[in-house]
From Swiss-Prot:
It holds the Pfam family YbjQ_1. This is UPF0145 protein BF0226. HAMAP family: UPF0145 (MF_00338). Belongs to the UPF0145 family. Coiled coil: none annotated. Gene3D superfamilies: Hypothetical protein apc22750. Chain B (3.30.110.70).
Length: 106
């Protein structure tokens, strides 16, 4: 499954547009991991443990979107967009959404 943020793929022809596809995942804050991440990762200016969780959430959302496109008969998703939004009463969870247009390329 080809995923692209662009509306076209150079050298390929779109023969079928299947429609909008999306995938979502929500990750919750872990108090203990947050505490240890702040101690361990602040020194370098980046939080490696947070980055890994975000990467996994992004990959899960993209995988769900790709599977939805595959079930429609598509072999690519164009115009892919990733959105990150805090949800929950105190913003304690993060929702990652991937969306795009499922197409068939030749």
């Amino acid at each position: 499954m080809l995923l692209a943020t662009t509306p076209i793929i150079e050298g390929k022809r779109i023969t079928t547009y299947y429609g909008i596809v999306s995938g979502e995942t929500i990750i919750g804050a872990n108090v203990f991991r947050d505490f240890f991440a702040s101690i361990r990762d602040i020194v370098g200016g980046r939080s490696g443990s947070y980055e890994e969780v975000l990467r996994e959430a992004k990959d899960t959302a993209l995988k769900e979107m790709s599977e939805q496109a595959r079930q429609m008969g598509a072999n690519a998703v164009i115009g892919v967009d990733l959105d990150y939004e805090t949800v929950g009463g105190s913003g304690s969870m993060l929702m990652v959404t991937a969306s795009g247009t499922a197409v068939f390329l030749e």
